[in-house]
Amino acid sequence: GRQTQVFAEALDASSTTLEERAGVIASCYVDCVLLQGREIPGVIAALSSSPELEALKRKYEAIFLDKCRAALAPFGQVSQAGLRAMLGAAEALSHAAASGEISREEAQQELLATILAMVSRSRS
Protein backbone atom coordinates (compact mmCIF):
# COMPACT_ATOMS: atom_id res chain seq x y z
CA GLY A 1 0.00 0.00 0.00
CA ARG A 2 0.90 3.58 0.64
CA GLN A 3 3.72 2.77 3.10
CA THR A 4 5.40 0.52 0.53
CA GLN A 5 5.38 3.41 -1.95
CA VAL A 6 6.78 5.89 0.60
CA PHE A 7 9.50 3.38 1.53
CA ALA A 8 10.45 2.75 -2.12
CA GLU A 9 10.63 6.50 -2.84
CA ALA A 10 12.74 7.18 0.26
CA LEU A 11 15.17 4.41 -0.72
CA ASP A 12 15.42 5.73 -4.29
CA ALA A 13 16.13 9.22 -2.98
CA SER A 14 18.77 8.08 -0.49
CA SER A 15 22.45 8.36 -1.31
CA THR A 16 24.52 5.30 -2.00
CA THR A 17 26.19 5.09 1.42
CA LEU A 18 25.37 2.10 3.58
CA GLU A 19 24.64 4.34 6.59
CA GLU A 20 22.09 6.41 4.70
CA ARG A 21 20.32 3.43 3.14
CA ALA A 22 20.21 1.59 6.48
CA GLY A 23 18.95 4.79 8.10
CA VAL A 24 16.10 5.05 5.58
CA ILE A 25 15.08 1.44 6.26
CA ALA A 26 15.18 1.98 10.04
CA SER A 27 13.33 5.29 10.09
CA CYS A 28 10.70 4.28 7.53
CA TYR A 29 9.85 1.06 9.34
CA VAL A 30 9.54 2.67 12.76
CA ASP A 31 7.65 5.70 11.42
CA CYS A 32 5.29 3.46 9.46
CA VAL A 33 4.31 1.56 12.60
CA LEU A 34 4.00 4.77 14.64
CA LEU A 35 1.84 6.39 11.93
CA GLN A 36 -0.50 3.43 11.98
CA GLY A 37 -0.86 3.99 15.68
CA ARG A 38 -0.81 2.02 18.86
CA GLU A 39 -3.37 -0.53 17.68
CA ILE A 40 -0.80 -2.23 15.43
CA PRO A 41 0.24 -5.02 17.84
CA GLY A 42 -3.44 -5.98 18.08
CA VAL A 43 -3.79 -5.82 14.31
CA ILE A 44 -0.72 -8.04 13.86
CA ALA A 45 -2.17 -10.54 16.34
CA ALA A 46 -5.49 -10.48 14.47
CA LEU A 47 -3.67 -10.94 11.14
CA SER A 48 -1.90 -14.00 12.49
CA SER A 49 -5.20 -15.58 13.56
CA SER A 50 -6.58 -15.85 10.01
CA PRO A 51 -4.86 -17.95 7.31
CA GLU A 52 -5.83 -15.47 4.57
CA LEU A 53 -4.56 -12.47 6.51
CA GLU A 54 -1.43 -14.35 7.58
CA ALA A 55 -0.73 -14.97 3.87
CA LEU A 56 -1.23 -11.25 3.14
CA LYS A 57 1.13 -10.31 5.98
CA ARG A 58 3.76 -12.73 4.61
CA LYS A 59 3.36 -11.21 1.14
CA TYR A 60 4.01 -7.69 2.47
CA GLU A 61 6.95 -8.94 4.53
CA ALA A 62 8.44 -10.58 1.43
CA ILE A 63 8.11 -7.31 -0.54
CA PHE A 64 9.74 -5.37 2.32
CA LEU A 65 12.59 -7.90 2.68
CA ASP A 66 13.22 -7.92 -1.09
CA LYS A 67 13.45 -4.12 -1.10
CA CYS A 68 15.86 -4.21 1.85
CA ARG A 69 17.99 -6.93 0.22
CA ALA A 70 18.19 -4.90 -3.00
CA ALA A 71 19.00 -1.66 -1.17
CA LEU A 72 21.77 -3.31 0.84
CA ALA A 73 23.13 -5.54 -1.98
CA PRO A 74 25.97 -3.17 -2.96
CA PHE A 75 27.36 -3.51 0.57
CA GLY A 76 27.14 -7.28 1.08
CA GLN A 77 25.15 -10.42 0.35
CA VAL A 78 22.63 -10.38 3.18
CA SER A 79 21.17 -13.80 4.00
CA GLN A 80 17.47 -14.55 4.34
CA ALA A 81 18.16 -15.41 8.01
CA GLY A 82 19.80 -12.01 8.49
CA LEU A 83 16.85 -10.23 6.88
CA ARG A 84 14.41 -12.16 9.09
CA ALA A 85 16.44 -11.20 12.18
CA MET A 86 16.30 -7.56 11.07
CA LEU A 87 12.53 -7.79 10.55
CA GLY A 88 12.05 -9.31 14.01
CA ALA A 89 14.09 -6.50 15.55
CA ALA A 90 12.19 -3.92 13.48
CA GLU A 91 8.81 -5.22 14.68
CA ALA A 92 9.87 -5.48 18.33
CA LEU A 93 11.48 -2.03 18.41
CA SER A 94 8.59 -0.37 16.57
CA HIS A 95 6.02 -1.87 18.92
CA ALA A 96 8.09 -0.82 21.94
CA ALA A 97 8.17 2.73 20.55
CA ALA A 98 4.42 2.66 19.79
CA SER A 99 3.65 1.63 23.37
CA GLY A 100 5.96 4.32 24.78
CA GLU A 101 8.44 1.84 26.29
CA ILE A 102 11.26 3.44 24.28
CA SER A 103 11.43 6.60 22.16
CA ARG A 104 11.07 6.75 18.39
CA GLU A 105 14.73 7.81 18.16
CA GLU A 106 15.90 4.92 20.34
CA ALA A 107 13.98 2.46 18.16
CA GLN A 108 15.45 3.92 14.97
CA GLN A 109 19.02 4.04 16.31
CA GLU A 110 18.89 0.46 17.58
CA LEU A 111 17.40 -0.78 14.31
CA LEU A 112 20.05 1.12 12.35
CA ALA A 113 22.78 -0.53 14.46
CA THR A 114 21.14 -3.93 13.87
CA ILE A 115 21.07 -3.40 10.09
CA LEU A 116 24.70 -2.21 10.00
CA ALA A 117 25.81 -5.24 12.07
CA MET A 118 23.85 -7.59 9.79
CA VAL A 119 25.55 -6.16 6.69
CA SER A 120 28.97 -6.24 8.31
CA ARG A 121 28.48 -9.94 9.20
CA SER A 122 27.51 -10.67 5.59
CA ARG A 123 30.83 -9.27 4.37
CA SER A 124 33.02 -11.57 6.45
Give the location of each predicted region.
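Regular secondary-structure segments
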Residues: 4, 8-11, 30, 87-98
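Short connector loops/turns at beta-strand edges and beta->alpha or beta->beta junctions
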Residues: 1, 35-39, 92
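Hydrophobic/aromatic-rich alpha-helical bundle segments in the mid-to-C-terminal region
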Residues: 41, 45, 54, 72-118, ...
